[in-house]
Each structure stands twice: as C-alpha cells, then as structure tokens.
Regions:
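PLP-dependent amino-acid enzyme catalytic core
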Residues: 1-131
C-alpha cells in the first residue's frame, strides 16, 4: 500500500524534492537531510476529527492517519508520545511570551524527543522487511 498522504521528501539544504520511499534516505543531489512533505488536501478529504476525540490512546499512534506509515501493524509496545505539557508562566514572563508551555519528553522510553522518530523508523523498516519476505 502506498503512503497516499505523502507527496515527497524535500531536502533541507538544496530544497529539491525527491520521491519518498525507503530507498531515499538522503538527498540524491547534495546528501542533505530529507523532510517528508504531506498532501494536506488528501488528508483533509479523508481525515475526520470525531474518531480522534474518541480514542483513549495518548501515544503518537492516536494520529495514525496522519503518519507516513501504511497502517496498523507491529507497532512497538512501548508508550511513545503523549508526554505531558506543563505551563511555564514564570519563564514565559521572563522571555516576554504570554503563554509558554514546555513538553516533558522525559516521559518517553529513553527520555528523548527522538523516541518518536525512532519508533517511526522501526515501523518503516518492518514494512520494508515484510515486503521483502512476501
């Protein structure tokens, strides 16, 4: 199944767009890092908010339809994402920010914001391994 919600991968250095896929790990033009680009019109046409409100899962998988994966599969059993936000009024006042919130990714398995990307990489690798064995 194709990732219908993804249009390509844009290089953060040269700005060129390449097809998004497992074989494209860095920019083929300059070796830069690639950012996934989404088809927001497609997402808007098929994504509905009410099922999201009904889901009790606080992890990143709550937003499955918005992620660049093919669908539910062998997701890691670790709780990734859904980490709390804390209001930081004193720091916000000092910095001149009216409403400042701080995300506590220390609640993730390795206490890092990188856990979301790592979980996504594991899923994508599993999808490719599954295709290789079909």
């Amino acid at each position: 199944m194709a990732m219908r919600n993804v249009t390509g991968a844009r290089c953060t250095i040269c700005g060129k767009v390449s097809p998004a896929g497992p074989e494209t790990t860095v920019c083929p033009h300059c070796g830069g890092i690639l950012d996934i680009e989404y088809d927001y019109d497609y997402i808007r046409s098929c994504f509905q908010k009410h099922p999201l409100r009904e889901r009790s899962d606080p992890t990143m998988w709550r937003y499955l339809e918005l992620l660049p994966v093919e669908g539910p599969g062998n997701f890691p059993h670790l709780r990734v994402g859904g980490s709390p936000l804390y209001r930081a009024d004193a720091l916000g006042k000092e910095l001149g920010i009216r409403e400042l919130w701080i995300k506590d990714d220390g609640q993730n398995p390795t206490a890092s914001l990188k856990d979301r990307a790592s979980a996504m990489a594991v899923i994508k690798a599993g999808e490719e391994i599954g295709r290789a064995h079909v």
